[in-house]
């Protein structure tokens, strides 16, 4: 962010966000190269396009020169595919400009975040809550006292033009919005992709993931902005602040009219939803709203959210995208774990003088387990096993060396062990390790044209244990290696604070 400020020399005159001229600046494409999601064409292998693997400033200079020479930045032809750029290498030019657009469109939001008074508090919280594992201790602390939960899938816009209209409240530069609209229609299949129930990130365009990640995050941010506003206002009914109310271009006028004419109704709505025990958390398009309230209150929340999305944001919210469940008999599918709050009966023996009593009590326990059936499906899609869970060889890796094959399988196994270390029951995790171990052995046997039994008999089974036991070796440095404790260790949940993204195999499920 400091680097961007140094380039742009931000001052008061830039508050109107004129972003279109930035497309003609070389440093924008350099930033796309430096901060890309490892998929930038500026440094990815481009054998099919005839360019080097490294970032080339000459390519950028030629692109900017061609943009200056054209009367219009984008030329549409009569062809059914309106992606013709400058009569040159249209694929390369289109992708380079889209990467520049991805950097530029983030500037108004990033700069406002840095200049906001809340930015320092956000920076402090991010240093301690950087890992997505940090949410599970929070859930364990909060969900034990709640009764019901709303499983919510964030709805999607019914048309791509709604995304552009929403961005108008943040970006006032009309030419840049027209260019953004073009790229949305260039990836016209995005509307059909976001309707899938599968994880969104896997379906983003491989050409420019950063561009679509930003659009999707902004879409989700807008969809829950008013909900967050109402949640805050439920504790401050006398407050009339509108800074947190993110709406369209003329939202100040709307809010003023709203507060004057409908103040009593607004406070009545807030009173209906006032719940000091409500908790809300989200990851990507999946959000959870839990409460200690009655089922009637949860139905009100569901009715309100559906009407809010459909009437205010024009989002298509299907009935099956919000489910009301009771925590005591329902698993929460979140971040690749199945979490639940189960009542656990226990007996307490109390001694009083010469008499003893046995008291039966029920304690709520927060459990997190590995969803074994979806994980087997993910392993089957990745060609490590069939859909019944039987390990198979990986023919695509058979051409690699033995050490590379073992290293690949070992890395996947260690990453899964690392990510699912918080599981309450390790049996499912051991089954996944077994599938990967035998798949590795079958791949090596296929390479050497031998059977698994004869191959393991010749080399010994110890060579596969090395990459499977590395996770335990790391734990031995962190925690004391006591025999009693080490046996208990694998039954306990361990949360790591260095995990910044969900596991790839979990995304496939």
From Swiss-Prot:
Protein name listed in UniProt: Maturase K
Keywords annotated in UniProt: Chloroplast, mRNA processing, Plastid, RNA-binding, tRNA processing
Gene Ontology molecular function: any one: RNA binding
Disulfides per UniProt: none
Species this protein is from: Clematis ligusticifolia
Predominant subcellular localization, coarse grouping: plastid
Gene Ontology BP term (one): tRNA processing
Signal peptide coordinates: none
One Pfam entry name: Intron_maturas2
HAMAP family to which the protein is assigned, alphabetical: MatK
UniProt GO cellular component terms: chloroplast
Family: Belongs to the intron maturase 2 family. MatK subfamily.
The keyword tRNA processing belongs to this UniProt entry's keyword annotation: yes
